[in-house]
């Protein structure tokens, strides 16, 4: 969701602060967004940030050596980046490209973990750095 949001105040442990960095837990008083519009893993960024909302990513992928099944194009999976977990499909295997059902916020260099929750054995398919 790309929209203008005004941060009125930030608090850490009931004390007002001017700014905070990850992984601090903060409370925000905001204007321009409702609680139902925000979910786990959502980010508030200024326009100059290196993060972007993407529907496709390419990875420098390393398959989990314990995951024995094959990976095929158009196969579904879940992708974890930070606190976000989104559904995706494999567009290509070499190089590994993923298409998301809903946009995901990420930047080059972050690690993405690919999951197959329906797998009866190993559920972590592998991981890779976002290119």
Cite the ranges covered by each PLM segment.
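C-terminal effector/interaction modules appended to NTPase cores
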Residues: 1-131
